[in-house]
Structures are given as structure tokens and as C-alpha cells.
Regions:
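Caspase-like cysteine protease fold
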Residues: 1-62, 148-160
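Surface-exposed coil/turn segments at beta-strand junctions on protein surfaces, enriched
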Residues: 46, 65, 101, 112-114, ...
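Short flexible loop/turn segments that cap and initiate beta-strands
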Residues: 58-93
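Surface-exposed loop/turn motifs at beta-strand-loop junctions within extracellular Ig-like
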Residues: 59, 78, 125, 140-144
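Beta-strand-rich interaction surfaces with strong enrichment in secreted/lumenal proteins
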Residues: 94-97, 105-112, 125
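Exposed aromatic-hydrophobic patches
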Residues: 118-124
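Short glycine/proline/serine/threonine-rich loop/turn segments at secondary-structure transition edges
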Residues: 125-135
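Short, compositionally biased serine/threonine- and acidic-rich segments at solvent-exposed termini, linkers
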Residues: 137-168
Length: 168
């Protein structure tokens, strides 16, 4: 058709690449994760377990920001899956393999009061049962400040034998 594959890769940057990105200075950390079915602290999320997550907004020096009151947006992701590009140009290039963490197990908003937050959720049954680690992703803000954080050391695997039976 006369269209070269190299012309498809041209693009224009909008904005000033010399500007520094406004990355929040405050950090968000998880302090405790509990399985409410067993009332135990856990390091693994099982399907159908009811989980309570507690955390804090910390200053640059690691202290709880008692003056921070705002909203926390949180997402919990299942393990990454392996994907491959399609090589639609049919060139001599090999398809590219990459990992993508796209399956969201929980997304919600909760209030942060005096730098502390907590929320509960039920881990869905349709998790990936392959061994691996999931991810918590956090963003909190108020009128004056914002904070970011992530926790990637949470194992998501198995089924909670203590989960309540759903008879509906």
C-alpha cells in the first residue's frame, strides 16, 4: 500500500521534557494485614478470604503524618501475566515478551484520618492460582499534600478453607 513501517513510529512530545515531574514527597505503607476469617496476621491472600489492611501516611523521614487527613485510593492487583506483542508489521523482528499486572482484585477509596487508614475487602475466587506476588498500589491526597506507595511482597495463592459458605 506504499506506507513504510518506519513512518508509523514518528510522534511529537507535547510539553517541556526539562520540567521535573511532581512526585509526592509523602509515602504510604502497610502496617498490618489481617485475615478476618481467622483473626490472624497474614502474608498471603487466599481466594474468598476477608482481609483487613491497615496503613499509614509517612513523612520523608518515616514518621506518621498526624496532620494528614484526606482520601486514599487503593488498588490490589493479582500476579502479573506473561504477554507477547503481535508483530503486526511482519518484519524480521521477534515478538517482544513482557509481564503485565492488569487483573484488579480490589479498588476502593477510604478516608485517611490523622495519617492512618484501614479498609476491608474479600479476595475474589477467580484469582490466578499460579505461585507469585501481587501488588498493593496507593495514592492519598488532601487540599495541600499528596502521597504515594506500593507494596509488592504479598503472595496471592490458594483458597481460604475458613471462608464462610455463600448460600445465596
Amino acid at each position: 500500500t506504499g506506507i513504510s513501517a518506519t513512518n508509523k513510529l514518528k510522534f511529537t512530545l507535547l510539553g517541556d521534557p526539562a520540567l521535573k515531574l511532581p512526585i509526592p514527597q509523602l509515602n504510604i505503607v502497610i502496617t498490618d494485614i489481617f485475615n478476618l476469617n481467622t483473626n490472624e496476621q497474614i502474608d498471603t491472600l487466599n481466594a474468598l478470604s476477608t482481609v483487613k489492611v491497615k496503613g499509614a501516611v509517612l513523612s520523608e523521614h518515616g514518621y506518621v503524618m498526624n496532620s494528614f487527613n484526606g482520601l486514599l485510593k487503593s488498588k490490589v492487583y493479582d500476579k502479573p501475566i506473561k504477554l507477547q506483542t503481535l508483530n503486526n508489521d511482519f518484519e524480521d523482528l521477534e515478538p517482544f515478551n513482557f509481564d503485565l499486572q492488569q487483573s484488579i482484585l480490589y479498588a476502593g477509596n477510604v478516608s485517611v484520618e490523622e495519617g492512618l487508614f484501614e479498609f476491608e475487602f474479600v479476595v475474589p475466587q477467580d484469582i490466578s492460582y499460579v505461585d507469585g506476588s501481587g501488588k498493593f498500589s496507593f495514592y492519598a491526597y488532601n487540599d495541600e499534600q499528596d502521597a504515594i506507595g506500593a507494596h509488592v511482597d504479598i503472595i496471592i495463592s490458594g483458597f481460604d478453607e475458613d471462608a464462610e459458605v455463600d448460600n445465596i
